[in-house]
């Protein structure tokens, strides 16, 4: 539909109206797609993809309702996305996680068109299934969406500090933020060293919790996101 719509302004108008009506109906009836066949892709190859109902609902849920684990609400680590999904299977994220080395941080990926993807939700639809051309550049609309979502998330959760390894300027005020990129690539030796140091310094006066199961907290987070509760 997106491919055909670009043939005329009227077609684009119809598609946008369709997406808006579908969004309103989905929110009213609670009809959202939560599971898809393995290998299904959500192709986001045009500007109009940003208005897709699935994408808009994700952005709204993350910004306004999503709640991370109580164990990881202190330090927020912002990371770039990767072409490979889920992100943790990529070589770049393997290096990021090795440098971070602390399970109490809250890892959130910055991406388009979803805006933000918390690490514990990277396996679910649509985070694990979207496909978008990667250029490394952000347009004003993408940055606006990301910053608005991030502002709401930080405000609601109440992180004490942010370790920013994403390369995106957050524009946030009133919170301690450490830029670990300094204009370098996310995977450079110096950037990774700064990432490791920033995380370590954030917890230098605290001891590691021993009764913390990341897997259990991940499942609880997915349950809260999908079902509104983690009380099993």
Label each region the model flagged.
Residues 3-6, 61, 99, 153, ...:
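Residues that form generic nucleotide/phosphate-binding pockets
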Residues 55-58, 67-148, 220, 231-232:
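Conserved mixed alpha/beta catalytic, RNA-binding, or beta-rich assembly cores of soluble enzyme
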């Amino acid at each position: 539909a997106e491919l055909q719509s670009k043939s005329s302004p009227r077609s684009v108008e119809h598609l946008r109206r369709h997406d808006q009506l579908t969004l309103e109906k989905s929110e009213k009836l609670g009809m959202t797609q939560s599971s898809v066949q393995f290998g299904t892709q959500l192709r986001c190859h045009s500007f109009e993809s940003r208005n897709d109902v699935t994408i808009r609902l994700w952005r709204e849920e993350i910004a306004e309702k999503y709640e991370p684990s109580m164990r990881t609400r202190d330090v927020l680590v912002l990371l770039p996305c990767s072409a490979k999904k889920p992100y943790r299977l990529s070589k770049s994220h393997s290096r990021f996680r090795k440098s971070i080395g602390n399970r109490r941080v809250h890892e959130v990926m910055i991406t388009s068109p979803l805006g933000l993807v918390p690490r514990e939700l990277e396996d679910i639809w649509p985070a694990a299934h979207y496909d978008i051309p990667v250029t490394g550049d952000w347009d004003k609309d993408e940055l606006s969406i990301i910053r608005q979502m991030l502002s709401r998330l930080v405000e609601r959760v109440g992180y004490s500090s942010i370790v920013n390894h994403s390369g995106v300027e957050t524009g946030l005020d009133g919170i301690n933020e450490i830029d670990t990129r300094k204009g370098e690539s996310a995977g450079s030796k110096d950037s990774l060293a700064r990432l490791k140091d920033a995380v370590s310094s954030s917890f230098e006066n605290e001891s590691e919790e021993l009764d913390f199961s990341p897997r259990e907290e991940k499942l609880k987070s997915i349950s809260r996101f999908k079902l509104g509760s983690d009380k099993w």
